[in-house]
Amino acid sequence: MAIASTLREQAIAPLSRADAERLLPQLSLGRQTIEKRVLRARCLKYVESFDVSWAELTQLLPQVKDRLLAARVAVDLVHLAYYLVRGEEAERITKAAQDHAASDPFLLAELRLGRSINLTAANEVTGALQEARWAEDALGAAPKGRARDLVMTRLQRQLAHLLSHAADYDAARAAADATTRFAARVGDPWETAWATYTGGFVAWMAGRNDEAVDHFTRAEAPLSTYRTSLWRYTLLCLARSRMERGELAEGDRLARQSATGAPEDHGHFALLRGEAEVAELILARAPRGFPADEHFRDFVRGIVRAERGDPRKGVRMLEDVARELGSRGLEHWALGAGVHAAYWREQLVRGAGASRAAQLVRDIGARGGEGFAYYLPDVAVWLGRAAEREPSTRRLARTIRARGEAALRRASTDSEAPVGASELDGATFHLRAVGLTWRELGILRELERVRSEGQRLDRDALAARLGVSPNTLRVHLTRIRAKLDVGEKRGDEVLLEAALAQGSVA
């Protein structure tokens, strides 16, 4: 009886990814009770087997008679609905679970959190913030301990994202700091990496790209071992931050290696490279998405329309997008659309956009920001220059202008760097998963380049190309050999072949 009670408590309690990885091997053994099946399905959710977890929990929900256990199943289904894009079902499940979940502060907080996440996916940030605050209130009644810290770090993470979307950049930074503190208490490497990524996301949204690059770089290394979508998205965010700083070649390479990103993301990358016609093709070929997707695509379409010779239509599209996003609480994106619309108004009528620049910079600064959505350096330079005339905005305007000019200078010197596709791009995910560092990947990429040029592979020449000593190169190659497990095969060419073979791993 005591064992069953413990199993029931585990099935109901909040779980971390480390808990799930520890419990899963045990849960496949022995008699499969309802409690064990629920716990196993929940563990599968945390290791991102979303479809399997959804199928099992959906099957179990009508069979569970224990009210708290049924509420737990429903809460996890609400969270899964976000990952599987089943927002309508989340509404139905939430209504069914509310009464039972209300008797447990953890369940109620997680139910509200799940509701908030699904509203975020629908671009309803005002409602999502309200749900997140209600979750915070519910968690106030929960007993202190690891379970409370675990739910709190996820809640603060959600708040950090929402407050960034709402352009409350100072509050978002505070929430990101809280996420880091609570994650440290939990002691789960997954939550710690999530918290580091969150700090990067908040910094990027606020326009602090140097800080964002630092956070994303630190988050990427531990996340690469999990082989999950979060690692890919972190790479995408790192690519975006670097490209906005003018590091076009490296950013473009990272974006390809991430193998993720929506059409609007890749359209933005094309705009950063100065390829408006490519952005237009990307968006034209994209299938019609959910309404929430189209809001952001219309934003980029407006910029592209203006870049491609129809600024009047572009301005109208951008102003429509700004109103729509603002009505949903997405103030960060509404402000960004306003900046781009003002820039193109200035191109149409001298002074028409500049008259709005100071107010836009004032609004960004009052919220704790230093940039804008779908950042383009040339737009930033114009915005800073136009707003410098106003004493109250001069300091921030000069910062915005200086960063834009630095990005343009960097991009002009970076434009000659090769950004062609590499066969290693397709293998990057697997190579990072087996432990190769970015430095080691760079060595493999140089090996590939030497081979493509038809040159003889010579370690001294390779070391000179890489800017390292032959001894340092030897150490790196030895480590690559061990990680790729090439055995006794001789020659450095076998390292490249083994690395490229990783691209065919399912």
Residue ranges of predicted features:
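Short, basic, alpha-helical segments at the C-terminal edge of helix-turn-helix-like DNA-binding modules
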Residues: E488-G503
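A structural signal for repeat-array scaffolds
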Residues: M1-E35, Q59-R67, K144
